[in-house]
Amino acid sequence: MIIIGSGPAGLAAAVYGQRAKLDLVVIEKQMISGGQILNTTEVDNYPGLPGIGGFELGQKFREHAEKLGAPFVTDEITEVRLNEDGTKTVVGSEGSYTAKTLVIASGAEHSLLGVPGEKELTGSGVSYCATCDGNFYRNRVTAVVGGGDVALGDALYLARLCQKVYLIHRRDSFRGAKILEDKVRETENIELVLDSTVEEIRGDGQLKSVLVKNKKSGAESELAIDGLFIAVGIVPESKNFPFLATDERGYVLGDESCETNVPGVYAAGDVRKKQLRQVITAVADGANAVESAVRYLTEQ
């Protein structure tokens, strides 16, 4: 078995794969495991480990897999081939790997604003997941950037926790569901900042404010905030798997078994089309993918 990615889904697959006595390898392009949780200062919704740091949780997952003997390779995937004999070959910058089964746990990358201060303050006030990190800003001032369902939902979620929420959107109308928009407009502690873009994220080691520019007037203003939640889209890491069926956004299609349209290939975690993307659901995917793979191998 080849496991691509060492976020929660890939690491859970490694644990379950080792326990199933599979001959496997985990391929990760980064030197550090954890995936998206590395961007989270604290993870407060993983049962049994309240308040654990995202980096620490990722390392605990990896240590567990390594303790069971799972081998890890640092390599960036460039191509995946489906062979006539049913095996799958993964080609990386450092070498190639062939196995009977493949678990794709490559994750999804949040779209960035691409403004000064964003990368420097990610994890120090800047987040891409309100349900993950919102509770850390209880009774404080936050802002959400975006205009779709996720941004509207994030603003409503944060409004229940925070003193005030700015919702910053580059247009004067939202592209999200009308029912969500109506709720946002009816919520007293949500202030709309429309026709506006974030030009800079400011802070010295910790987020302090954002510089916002009105597109119509050209006027700039600085909003003092404690937390910034960026919800301008997410991009699944599925480009290396053109043989897989995906939805219009690139998420791999598959049910809770994590099976895809290709026998012996499984999609787990954020790369899979699913309703909830959290650490706990990614871990479940990793377990289900291995269970499905074991069943596939047994039937061969």
Give names to the regions the model predicted:
Residues M1-V25, A155-A159:
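N-terminal Rossmann-like FAD-binding beta1-loop-alpha1 element of flavoenzymes
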Residues G7-P8, I32, A108-H110, D149-V150, ...:
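Residue-level detector of alpha-helix initiation sites
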Residues Q18-R19, Q30, R138-L161:
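Rossmann-like NAD(P)H-binding beta-loop-alpha module
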Residues A65-V91, S96-A99, R160-E256, R295-E299:
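A Rossmann-like FAD-binding core segment of flavoenzymes
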Residues R19-N39, Y166-R175:
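Glycine-rich FAD pyrophosphate-binding loop
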Residues E109, G114, E120-F136, I230-T281, ...:
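FAD-site-proximal beta/loop scaffold in flavoenzymes
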Residues Q30-G53, A177-D182:
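Conserved N-terminal glycine-rich FAD pyrophosphate-binding loop of Rossmann-like flavoproteins
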